Structure formats: C-alpha cells, structure tokens
Design a protein with these regions (language model features):
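Conserved donor-binding/catalytic core segment of Leloir-type glycosyltransferases
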Residues: 189, 229-258, 270
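Donor nucleotide-sugar binding/catalytic pocket of nucleotide-sugar-dependent glycosyltransferases
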Residues: 168-224, 233
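Conserved acidic donor-binding segment of nucleotide-sugar-dependent glycosyltransferases
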Residues: 350-351, 355-362, 371-376
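Short hydrophobic beta-strand element within catalytic cores of glycosyltransferases
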Residues: 335-338
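Aromatic "clamp/platform" in nucleotide-sugar-dependent glycosyltransferases that forms part
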Residues: 318
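Nucleotide-activated donor-binding/catalytic signature segment of Leloir-type glycosyltransferases, i.e.
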Residues: 279-298
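N-terminal subdomain of nucleotide-sugar transferases
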Residues: 1-62
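A short, well-ordered alpha-helix in the C-terminal region of glycosyltransferases
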Residues: 364, 371, 378-392, 404
Length: 416
C-alpha cells in the first residue's frame, strides 16, 4: 500500500551550520521525511556576517544534502546572534519577515515548529525573537495543524541562571506564560515522559509524549573504534561531547577530575566541543597538563571514533532534554555517567548501562566514574549492555512513530 505524500513545513530555530543537538536532529528529521517521499519546506535561520566566521566552515550535514532531493525547498529567515551566545541564532521580529505568507504559498498539510519557545524569544527574555508564537497566525487563519516539537528545557535554563530564589518568584507567573504559549499549538510533542510531566504541572496545554528524539544506531556503533582519534594513547578515557557553556556544567568536570585522578592516576579527560566558556576551561585545564585534553569541535568519523573509544561518557548537565549525546555514547557501547535530571533516568539505568550522580556534586560524580574505571568486570558488563539499552530509540523506529502521528493529525484536521 502506497503511503500518502504529505506537504510538511518545518520551521526551526537552529539548523546547520549552527551547531547544536537541535540542529542535528532537525536535519535528520528533514532527511528521513524526504526519503519517504514527503514534500518538505524548511524555514531556517540565515547565516550572515554577524556570526563568527568559523561557523560557515563547519563540515556538518545540512542544506547541501537536503537540496539533492527534488521534493525539498527552503527559506532562510533573517536572524541575528543570540545576545549572550553569539554562535546561536535568534529570528528577527515578524516586522521583518512573515511566516504566514511563507506558509500560505507552500500550502502545507501540517506545520512543525522546532524550538518554538526559543524562536519566540524566551532565551533572551523577549529582548529578541519573533514577537509571537511562530506559526500561530497561520493556524488561526487556516485550521491547518501546527505542532510544537519540544527540545530545550528553558525552565531549567531560567532556574540555572537566575538561581532558586528568583526562580521561585517567577514560578508565580511562569505557568501563565507556558499555558498561553502552548495554546498557540495543536499539540506539543515531548520526547521525555519526565519533561512532559514537568511541563504539564506548569500548565502546558495539549502536551503529548512521542519518542521522536532518536539517533542513527547504525552510524553510532562500537565498531567505530577503527576511527580512534588517539590510537596510541592507552590511558582510560572519560569523554564529554557538547557545547562548552555554563548550563552544561563543564566546569564541574574539572572539579571532579582531580578526585578521579587520585584513584585512577593515568585517567584522561577529553572535552569535545566549543562555546563561550572555551577560554576559561582551557585556562583551568592547564594545571592538569596532559591529563585533560580540550579537543575543540569534532565531526564525521573522528567524532564517531571518540564515542567508541571512550571508557566512560560523562554528562554533568542538569538542563538536558533526552540528551542526544548520551544516546550516541550508549549506541557506541560506552557506559554513561550523568546526573539525576528530567529525562536522564529514561536513558541511564544505574548498574545496567551506567550511573546517575547527585546534581551539582562533583564528589559523587567522581565516585560514579571511579566505580566503573577501577572495576574492569563492571565496565565490561555496562559496555555490553549499553547498546541494547538504547536500540528502541533508533532513528527509523522513532520517525515511523512520528510520521504515523502526523498522518493522524492531518486526517483529524480534514474532518473538522
């Protein structure tokens, strides 16, 4: 039976060459939908001379791959750097471009908005952003379903940067904002049950759990050890991959490192990524000499090699939403030590494929890493169980569920 071809508009706050887990996920989604024969219209941030020059030179998959499909079209909306993070974009206000006009010309069956909150301006406390919920005006005028695809736990970011006292004051009004914002969409998809429960308590309307945040389990695989970036270095390796930002708690890895090294003297911490804290992290790492390597960004087979080579993948962030790199490490056969936070318990099962540490507790985090590295039998067992534990989140399996839900939403809208 031939599947019906859908016309799908995807509006995203981040896309290649801007580097983030969101951008990677959006491109994978676009590619999979194109491969199924759907018509995809991607509305993405433009890259311009306001951004650091190295962004344009990143060897990441993006438009060039999508443009090879005849069923693909795109529009780059005007953007500017995020106030406190110049390597990520924010859309210009709707006075400068019109999502309703773009969508009306394409005539989609359904619209997906990836990172809707960020595009609205939540990251910049509304000093930047589109000025209204993206896609909401088109939805009101046409009745075409518009879906918000949740990626970033903005509430966790607010708590992290403002602290508990100010955050608790904001809790009086946050549910009002979240309720009003979520009502602009037919449904908000959450890839984490814990995140969905958290936002439902904050009055998020029409929320729905859908395991759409998959990874390519064929690409991320233990056999990628053949791409080991440092094959002559036989020290036990703990690996972090991600943006080097405050909310990722990268500094806490440097707090935990000497505690780990006291028990595992030849341990090697490798930090892969870039971000605003680059200089600070490099400065702090100097005291540990060759014990810590700040690798910078990594792409392609080199990155695959890092995931497969690592003995333990570490993630101290308390702001993750079903973290992609956690899953990529597990698919590569590498146990994960993360902290207790919404969604991490859905990825890491203590004693099965890794351990969960107390948040913001470098000593407990170090002890969890040490427990793995000083016990070869335990490490082997965790590594053996890591990949099977995450196969249900293979990209194709997740996208088939996602596609099925899109069909349901389109069919329901046509009956109205």
């Amino acid at each position: 039976m031939t599947k019906q071809t859908l016309r799908i508009a995807i509006i995203t706050g981040v896309y290649a060459p801007f580097l983030s887990g969101v951008g990677v996920a959006v491109h994978q989604r676009v590619r999979w939908l194109l491969q199924q024969g759907h018509e995809v219209f991607l509305i993405h941030p433009e890259i311009n001379d306001k951004y650091p020059k190295d962004i344009c030179e990143r060897p990441v998959l993006g438009l060039a791959e999508a443009q090879a499909f005849p069923n693909f079209s795109s529009y780059a909306y005007p953007s500017q750097p995020l106030l406190l993070y110049k390597s990520l974009p924010e859309p210009l206000h709707y006075r400068y471009w019109n999502d309703t006009e773009l969508l009306s010309k394409f005539q989609p069956d359904i619209v997906l908005v990836e990172e809707a909150g960020a595009m609205r301006g939540f990251y910049s406390l509304f000093l930047q952003g589109y000025g209204r919920p993206v896609g909401s005006d088109f939805r009101k005028r046409t009745g075409i379903p518009v879906v918000s695809v949740f990626h970033t736990d903005i509430v966790a970011y607010i708590r992290y940067y403002l602290g508990n006292y100010l955050f608790n004051l904001l809790l009086l009004i946050l549910p009002i904002f979240i309720k009003q914002f979520s009502e602009a969409y037919d449904v908000t998809f959450f890839s984490s049950l814990e995140q969905q429960a958290k936002y439902k308590k904050l009055k998020c309307q029409r929320s729905e759990y859908l395991p759409y945040q998959g990874i390519d389990c064929e690409r991320f695989h233990p056999r990628n050890i053949c791409y080991d970036p440092i094959p002559d270095d036989h020290r036990p390796t703990i690996l972090f991959v991600g943006r080097v930002t405050a909310e990722k708690n990268v500094n806490q890895l440097l707090d935990a490192y000497p505690l780990i090294a006291a028990k595992i003297p030849d341990v090697h911490l490798v930090i892969v990524g870039s971000g605003p804290l680059d200089k600070e992290i490099r400065r702090r790492a100097q005291k540990f000499k060759s014990g810590i390597t700040i690798w910078g960004e990594s792409h392609g087979t080199e990155l695959l090699g890092w995931f497969a080579r690592a003995d333990v993948f570490v993630n101290p962030s308390v702001t993750e939403n079903f973290c992609t790199t956690n899953n990529e490490a597990l698919a590569s056969g590498t146990p994960v030590v993360a902290v207790v936070a919404p969604s991490t318990a859905e990825q890491v099962s203590p004693g099965l494929n890794g351990f969960l540490a107390e948040p913001n507790n470098p000593k407990d985090f170090a002890q969890k890493v040490i427990a793995i590295l000083e016990n070869p039998h335990l490490k082997a067992e965790l590594s053996h169980r890591a990949r099977p534990s995450i196969l249900e989140f293979d990209w194709s399996a997740c996208m088939q569920k996602f596609e099925h839900r899109l069909y349901q939403l389109v069919e329901a809208s046509r009956k109205c």
